[in-house]
């Protein structure tokens, strides 16, 4: 996308990043249409699209094309199911505004360590557990998982 924007002499600003994000994610909702729609897949889509989810869904709906009218109708029906699931999961989990309850600063303070890859790995485990629905999106559950993960990595609180 940046190369195209440069060729067209368009600004490489937030609008370019917005277009890039939509292009990167535009096949995700369509993939959900053909598979069983899980809460986890919807949470991840909501998390990655963030506030641009509505625009992404409009783009994806416009992208449903085929010469076979029956196929188009079936895809549109399945797409409507995905949209319902998005609303349901968003209402239940508030994923669009997701913020990991565990911060790198907290991990460094508790375990008296300097910035390193372990911090990112712990945060990633917590984030994935929340997005997969394994733990609720709250501080206590995230903190417990952080401690468990840190212990497995050999970190001890001082």
Predicted features along the sequence, with ranges:
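Divalent metal-dependent catalytic cores for phosphoryl transfer on phosphate-bearing substrates
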Residues: 1-74
């Amino acid at each position: 996308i940046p190369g195209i924007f440069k060729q067209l002499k368009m600004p490489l600003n937030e609008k370019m990043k917005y277009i890039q994000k939509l292009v990167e994610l535009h096949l995700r909702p369509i993939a959900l249409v053909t598979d069983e729609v899980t809460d986890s897949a919807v949470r991840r889509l909501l998390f990655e699209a963030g506030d641009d989810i509505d625009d992404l869904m409009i783009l994806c709906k416009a992208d449903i094309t085929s010469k076979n009218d029956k196929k188009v109708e079936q895809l549109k029906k399945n797409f409507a199911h995905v949209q319902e699931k998005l609303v349901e999961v968003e209402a239940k989990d508030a994923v669009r505004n997701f913020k990991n309850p565990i911060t790198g600063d907290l991990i460094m303070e508790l375990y008296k360590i300097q910035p390193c890859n372990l911090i990112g790995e712990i945060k990633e485990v917590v984030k994935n557990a929340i997005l997969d629905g394994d733990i609720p999106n709250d501080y206590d559950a995230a903190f417990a998982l952080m401690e468990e993960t840190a212990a497995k990595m050999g970190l001890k609180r001082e």
